[in-house]
């Protein structure tokens, strides 16, 4: 496995087909997001000075706006500001399932043979078993998960603070990015400042129970400072890099920083 994943669609054939079948749905979500942002044809023409029928010119402008938005969010991100926490009584036990495929296509992962692979700017790259992860000190948080589709839910998440894990494996904490690869072919990445935020967890449990497959068993990233698509499930690999790694939906037009 290289230091960074490909920015092409997921590479595992079965999982690739599952995600590629969702491309039409993804384009529809992107269209809705664009409309929600309130950029009418007239407003876009006025803003860009472009003929909006020139799709390449418009896309170039939108890409530039997205990059500017990412930079602006990174500049105002406060790594010491905590997201609100809630009483356990407000945590939803039957948390909503959300993915771009049905529950019959959820990856089937054998916990006994599971390995978390590490690569990139990391001193100790030996793979971790699930039992290795369970033996690490764990903490819990009750925070709100915010989806880009417009819904949110409060959940109780238990796992290992990601900062603790990165320190344990000897990751270069001055590097720019941390990336994730998942059993369903999904891939994601976050900035190092967000990775080190005290509420960013490698999650092993939800509502005090081992993650069910639909919630990302055996390992999910919980990062309440970002939108839901930045919380990858079914994680099988983590890497640290200074090269921008991209991410699945962001490579298709979503904002990369995606702060809440």
Put a short name on every predicted segment.
Residues 6, 10-12, 47, 100, ...:
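Intrinsically disordered, low-complexity segments enriched in small/polar residues
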């Amino acid at each position: 496995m290289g230091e960074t994943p490909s920015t092409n669609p997921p590479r595992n054939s079965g999982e690739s087909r599952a995600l590629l079948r969702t491309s039409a749905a993804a384009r529809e979500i992107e269209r809705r997001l664009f409309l929600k942002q309130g950029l009418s044809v007239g407003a876009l023409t006025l803003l860009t000075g472009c003929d909006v029928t020139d799709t390449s010119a418009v896309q170039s402008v939108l890409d530039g706006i997205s990059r500017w938005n990412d930079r602006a969010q990174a500049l105002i991100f406060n790594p010491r500001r905590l997201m609100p926490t809630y009483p356990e009584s407000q945590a939803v036990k039957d948390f909503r399932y959300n993915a771009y495929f049905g529950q019959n296509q959820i990856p089937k992962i054998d916990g006994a043979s599971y390995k978390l692979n590490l690569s990139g700017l990391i001193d100790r790259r030996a793979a971790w078993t699930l039992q290795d992860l369970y033996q690490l000190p764990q903490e819990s948080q009750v925070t709100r998960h915010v989806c880009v589709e417009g819904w949110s839910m409060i959940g109780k998440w238990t796992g290992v603070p990601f900062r603790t894990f990165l320190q344990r494996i000897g990751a270069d904490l001055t590097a720019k990015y941390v990336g994730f690869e998942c059993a369903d072919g999904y891939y994601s990445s976050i900035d190092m400042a967000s990775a080190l935020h005290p509420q960013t967890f490698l999650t092993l449990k939800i509502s005090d129970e081992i993650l069910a497959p639909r919630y990302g068993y055996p390992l999910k990233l919980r990062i309440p400072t970002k939108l839901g698509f930045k919380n990858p499930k079914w994680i099988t690999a983590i890497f640290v890099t200074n090269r921008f790694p991209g991410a699945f939906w962001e490579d298709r037009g979503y904002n990369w920083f995606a702060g809440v």
